[in-house]
Amino acid sequence: MQMCEQLGQINTTIMTNSIDNAVRLMLNKLPEVELLGGKIDKGNRYTYSMETLSQLDNITFDAAFIGTSKIQPDGVMVVDSYDAAIAKKVVERSRKVILIAQKYKFVTNNSSPYKSANLKDIDVLITDVPLEEKYRKYFKPDIKIKYVKEDETK
């Protein structure tokens, strides 16, 4: 959601399946927003469908911003299989993949069984504090890491 505030004046098109992100992005004239369709997961506030996955096969993204509920040595993890499937497809179809993850996502014990991306596919990591070397090694050597404190996005 904080990233949406940063994107509020950029002349681009943002495609999302997140209801909350779409609503936040609509507060400004720019950017143009496309909400992917399908069923609504009311608990997690996103949309999903098989048609969405097919639609994504025909799109190439300049950049994909993805989130996570947990980071493990083998990947970016989320709590729902539909969310994972959409994120995987977007990662496949993107020229650049940007992961947004606070440091606690590396140490959480939350159950997040579905992999949405391989860590080697991540080009940029946006996080809140410098990573310990053991976590930095999860990613490819040339990853760009941007540290953003929460209040820097306001």
Residue ranges of model-derived segments:
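Glycine-rich beta-alpha loop segments
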Residues: 2-8
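Short active-site oxyanion
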Residues: 9-14, 121-124
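Conserved SAM-binding loop
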Residues: 14-15, 79
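Conserved phosphate- and dinucleotide-binding cores of soluble alpha/beta proteins
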Residues: 22-154
